[in-house]
Amino acid sequence: MENQINKSAEKSAEKSAENSAAPVIDFNKFRPTRSHIAARKRKDMLMRVLIFLSFVVALIPLISLLLTTIINGIKRLNFDFLTHNMTYVVGGNATGTGGYGGILHAIIGTLEITLGAMVISIPIGLMCAVYLVEYARGNKISRIINLLVDVMSGIPSIVAGLFAFSMFALLAGPGTINGFEGSVALSLLMIPTVVKSSQEMLKIVPNDLREAALALGVTKQRTITKIVLRTALPGIVSGCILAVARVIGETAPLLMASGFIASTNFNLFDGQMTTLPVYVYQEYSKLSANCPANAPASCVTTIPMERAWAAALTLIVLVLLLNILGRVVARVFSVKAK
């Protein structure tokens, strides 16, 4: 009797042990097979090829533009072209120096007008960004200012030129045209870009830096100038360079606000000034130069187009130099870890 009881107890114990045992999972069922691995590799290779082709397609217009400009512009781009203006240039005839005119006046006009626009727009845009991020974050005023900045970023460039022309006509008299007027027109186009880029860079600065400075008793103004702006300086400089590249190629507002002359004008506040984009437009609109039947052999009918391509190449090089300068400045003044 006792043996039967023991056997039944052993059987019940075995059954309970079997029921309480953890289930055995066969992981071999989840192991990828060779066909699955090969399919994954094919998909990975396909995506790599598609991404590379997309990159190549995106590069084709840029490379084509650069090659076309270099091939057509390098023929006329020389020292004489860079150091002379269009004074005494008639048709396709050579001047007394043996050249065919140049872009010295356009280079000076471009640099002065762009510098004037930077002096106006960068302080205004940077102070606006500091106010939006450090003082008025999330309130009603900041939302209104952001809306106005978004509206300004969508203003056509010709409208900015018309505004500057109308404003100076009211302040200085009808028909007033000078380089500073062009700077005002370009500053209207630069300010939204400076505000947006600076605003994003200031938001990236960690709040821990602000809180640590304030905990040490540093004033808010000094925290902004010495810590926040210093930390965000590389991004701010890049945004300003982007804004300059945005406006340095504008033509329509400068045709209205700054005009076009053949001589060199160094005075930003008096008289018309020529910029490189306006120069390209003026030369391209000529299509060809007039060479009469009795003209000398040095007369070149295609000289306007050659000058236009050379000026366009100079403008591209100028933008490239500005980008390099901006990167150098950002690297020099950036915060370095010790």
What feature does the model see in each segment?
Residues 150-188:
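Generic hydrophobic transmembrane alpha-helix motif, especially the helices
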Residues 1-104, 108, 112, 292-317, ...:
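N-terminal, non-cleaved signal-anchor transmembrane helix
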Residues 46, 103, 107, 111, ...:
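Hydrophobic alpha-helical elements at and bordering transmembrane segments
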Residues 116-149, 170, 327-335:
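Transmembrane-helix boundary motif in ABC transporter permease subunits
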Residues 254-316:
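Interhelical loop and adjacent transmembrane-helix boundary motif
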Residues 100-131, 240:
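Transmembrane alpha-helix signature in integral membrane proteins
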Residues 124, 137-141, 206, 210-238:
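Amphipathic cytosolic juxtamembrane alpha-helices at the membrane-cytosol interface
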Residues 118, 197, 220-258:
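Transmembrane alpha-helices
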